[in-house]
Amino acid sequence: MEAALSHKISGADKFQLLLDRHIRLNQPTGNIIQLSIEVKGRIELEELRKVVNANSFLTQLNSLQVTDNTLSIPRWINGEEQYPVSLTEFPYKSAKVSEGLIDIALFQDVTNTKVLILVHHVLADNMGIQQIARLIDGTIKPPLLPLTEGVKDTTPLIQQLVHTLKATLLVFRKTPKHMAKLVAAEVVTKTFILDFDDKQTILIEENAAKNGARLSRSAFYLAAVSMALKQTIFAGNGDSFFLPVPQNQRLRGNDQLAMGNHLSFLFYNIPFNKLNNLSEATAFITAQMVEQIKDQSPKSYSYLLKTFRFLPLWLYDFFFKMPTKGAVCSFLFSDVGETLPDMKTFMGKEIVEVLNLPPNPCPPHITFVMMKHAGTLKLIMTYNSKAISEDEISKFEIALDTLLIE
């Protein structure tokens, strides 16, 4: 662990700190990601507490802090105090109950146990939180990889600056003039899950191919979500969607735990007039994806995030809100893919279900995660019920279900 105690945070980590700042304007819980694991049988709270407290690395990880010095790049440092990971039983008072970066909540029903792992997003991305679960379970052992880029960047400075400029121009070019966005003064977070069975999953994946998503099914999923939103929740709201979609920057085959956010982004401007049918929408989104990948846009955006690490949050905030005139995006969407292949048991018990729950949705009031576990697809939506009505959610579910499975 010692090697991680004075690492500069990554550019994507700094971006998560910015989102945390926005979220805390409306509610105290901040930028939290959650992983829900349901197992067959009972896991007792004290049994889990004993396992967690015996793992000194988890305590160190939970107690890390980020420095926030003006005009210097924030760093991960060891906290002055060591906080054991907080464990509690449902119902818990809030989505973040302790001083540390990790919390665990437990829920028992008659036959099964649900374990909810809550982690500050600056510490982990969706892959990272799954690996924290494996660390708790003992599937993997410390020491673990650093909390920032593991490979030294040898790209010349002038090339890094060129990439930064390219990314800046890309964001301004992609941002629509009349972006659809949701507005609400209050925040009441709710979660909605569309859980597809084996047959539905096969049908959806076949439909993705039929509609032209041969390079990436994510384009089809995003097209379907965008069309359903246009027809329901965003009906009459703006004329185009704008959103960043995370792209995993971890090295393929790297099964070790690397904390922090190893992400860049692809940016999509999706005019409503391109959302007339699934084939057209999928082709339009795929074309933007291919163009940006060929142009190395994710790499360029990584350098932009890296360059902006030294900025104080208020100035960083200004730069990122300027292209969108104050809004972050229309909605957030991530396709996190299949859960880790060895997530079949937890604490010696068979896993029934795993859910990568979306982070706090504010901003922009609505967030989607598409994922797959044990061969079946799930779409998880976290939304602000003060910005979106239950009637709109019901209509959205019907529209999306029809688009995906028709």
Feature roles, as predicted:
Residues M1-L157, S218-F241, T345-E406:
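Non-catalytic N-terminal regions of enzymes
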Residues L45-E47, V52, N261-G337:
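Helical lid/core segments from catalytic subdomains that handle acyl or acyl-like groups
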Residues T155-L165, A287, F333:
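Low-complexity, serine/threonine/proline-enriched polar segments
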Residues Q159-L215:
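Flexible, P/S/T/G-rich "lid" or insertion loops adjacent to the active sites of thioester-utilizing
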Residues K190-A283:
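Long, internal scaffold/assembly segments composed of regular secondary structure
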Residues F234, N254, F320-P323, L357-P358:
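Short proline/glycine-enriched turn/loop segments at secondary-structure junctions
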Residues Q247, D335, M381-S385:
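Active-site proximal loops enriched in glycine and acidic residues that flank catalytic Cys/His/Asp
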Residues L251, G337-L340:
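Short, charged/polar surface micro-motifs in flexible loops or helix N-caps
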